[in-house]
C-alpha cells in the first residue's frame, strides 16, 4: 500500500506499532518495513507497547533487506508505561485496595472482585481533573542509539515486568536514570506525561 502523496525526503517515523501492541496496532513488523521502503523512506522505529516481542522479527527482516543491497536502518524501541515513582505507585495501589475493601465491607455488599482495583485502559489516555494519580499510566517512547542503548532498552523492559507489573509493566524516573545511557527518550502521544500536564494546565510541574 502506497501513500497518496510522496513523503518528505528525510522523514523517519519514530513511533510505530504492530500487532504486538494489543488493540493498538496491526500486522507484522515486516509489513510495516515494506510499507516504509515502498514509500521512499529508509528507516523506521518499532515501538510496541510495553514489550520488545516484535524486535527480533524486525531485525530479521531488516537483515534480509540489507543483504539484497537496499539501504535500510531498523531503529529499536518500545513505548513504555511510565509512572513517576514505582514505590509511591505501589503504596497508593495497596492503599486503594484497602479503601475499596473497607467501603465494600461497610456497605455489606458482596462482590466477586472485592479487594481488587480495576484499571481501565481508556481512563489512562483521557484528561480528567482530580483523577487518582495512581490510576494513570503515562506513555513514554524510548529508542536505542547504539548497542549499549539496546542493552539498556531490554533491561528496562525486563525490569518493567519484574518491578512494576500490575496488568501492565511500568518503569519510573529512577529506573530510567539508571539505564539511560545510549537511549533517546521522547514524549510519545497524548498519553505522555507532558502532554497530560499541558492539557491539565500544569505543564511546568516537576
Feature map (PLM): residue ranges:
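Phosphodiester-processing cores and adjacent nucleic acid-binding clamps
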Residues: 1-206
Amino acid at each position: 500500500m502506497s501513500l497518496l502523496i510522496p513523503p518528505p525526503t528525510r522523514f523517519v517515523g519514530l513511533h510505530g506499532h504492530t500487532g504486538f501492541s494489543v488493540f493498538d496496532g496491526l500486522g507484522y513488523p515486516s509489513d510495516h518495513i515494506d510499507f516504509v521502503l515502498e514509500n521512499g523512506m529508509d528507516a523506521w522505529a518499532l515501538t510496541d507497547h510495553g514489550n520488545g516481542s516484535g524486535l527480533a522479527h524486525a531485525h530479521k527482516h531488516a537483515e534480509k533487506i540489507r543483504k539484497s543491497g537496499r539501504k535500510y536502518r531498523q531503529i529499536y524501541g518500545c513505548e513504555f508505561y511510565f509512572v513517576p515513582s514505582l514505590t509511591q505507585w505501589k503504596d497508593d495501589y495497596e492503599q486503594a485496595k484497602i479503601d475499596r475493601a473497607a467501603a465494600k465491607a461497610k456497605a455489606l455488599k458482596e462482590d466477586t472482585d472485592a479487594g481488587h482495583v480495576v484499571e481501565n485502559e481508556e481512563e489512562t489516555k483521557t484528561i480528567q481533573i482530580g483523577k487518582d494519580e495512581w490510576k494513570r499510566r503515562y506513555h513514554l517512547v524510548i529508542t536505542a542509539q547504539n548497542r549499549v542503548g539496546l542493552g539498556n532498552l531490554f533491561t528496562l523492559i525486563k525490569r518493567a515486568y519484574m518491578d512494576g507489573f500490575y496488568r501492565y509493566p511500568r518503569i519510573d524516573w529512577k529506573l530510567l536514570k539508571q539505564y539511560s545511557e545510549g537511549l533517546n527518550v521522547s514524549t510519545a502521544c497524548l498519553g505522555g506525561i507532558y502532554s497530560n500536564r499541558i492539557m491539565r494546565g500544569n505543564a511546568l510541574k516537576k
